[in-house]
Amino acid sequence: MKVAVCLHGLARGSSVQADGAFLENYSTLLKKIRGADIFIHSWDEDIKERLIQIFSPISNIFEPQRKFSKEISFFRGVQFDGDTGINQGDLFKTLSFLYSRKESVRLKKEYEKKNNFKYDVVLVSRFDVGHHNNGLNKTSHLNFDPALDMSKIYQAYWNQTNAGASDHWFYSSSQNIDYLTLLYDKLPEHLNKHSDYTKLCKKGWPLSNAEDEFSGELFKEEKSKNLCQYVSGDNVLINNHSLYKFHLMEGNLWEDDQSIFLNKNLWHD
C-alpha cells in the first residue's frame, strides 16, 4: 500500500496557539504517518532545514508568505460584509490556506506522474495535529487509518456539520484528494453574488436548521425544512467550512455514506 501525506501552511500555527507541535518536533503527527511519503508546502522559510530534517519529504516548497494582491484584486467590488449568519472569513487567509494545501497536493501529483503510479491513500493536513488551540480543538486530533475504504472521504467529526466541514485534515483516494484541492481554483466562481454557492447561502443552506445550528441534519432521516439564511442582499460569505461543504456536495462526496466523520467519541463528554 502506497501512502502519501501532504502537509501545508504555517508549521508553527498562526493566530491560534498551536506551536506545541513545533516544540515537540511533530512527534504526535509522525506517529500517525510513519512510513508514508511526505510532501510539504510551507510559508515558514526560516525553519526549512529543520522541517526537512524532521519529515524527510519526497518533495517540498518553502516560500515567503504570498500577499495574493493580484488574486484579491479579482474580487474588487464583491461585498464581503460582516453581517452574516455565521462567521465571515478573511479573503487573504482563505486564499493562503487553500493555495498552500493545493500546492502540497500538486507536489504529490507531479511525483505520481513522474513515476507512473497513484497513491492508494492520501492524507492532506495542517502541521499542528493534536495541538491546535493547545490541543483543545477536537477537530485537530488525527484519526488516520489507511486500511479504510478510500472511495470515501474521511474528516474530523464536529458539531457544526450543518455549516460545513471541519477542514483541519482529510484523507481518501488520490483522485478524491486531487478534487478536494480544486476548491482554490473555484473561489472566483463561488465568491460572487450570482453563484450557486451564494444563492444557497441566501435562500437556504442545505442540511441546516435555523432553529438549531448543532442539530447534525446530515445524519438525520427526517431533515429540517427550516434552513439557515447566511447572507442577504449582495453580500457574499467567505467561510472555509461552508465552501468545503459546497465543494464536496458538487463532487457527490458530502452524502452521509461518502463523507465519514471520525472521532465522534471526543464530543461525548
How would you name each of these model-derived features?
Residues 24, 49-58, 137-145, 248:
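Short, aromatic/basic amphipathic alpha-helical patches
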Residues 15-19, 49-52, 131-138, 142, ...:
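A short acidic (Asp/Glu
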Residues 1-20:
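N-proximal low-complexity "stem/linker" segments adjacent to membrane-targeting elements
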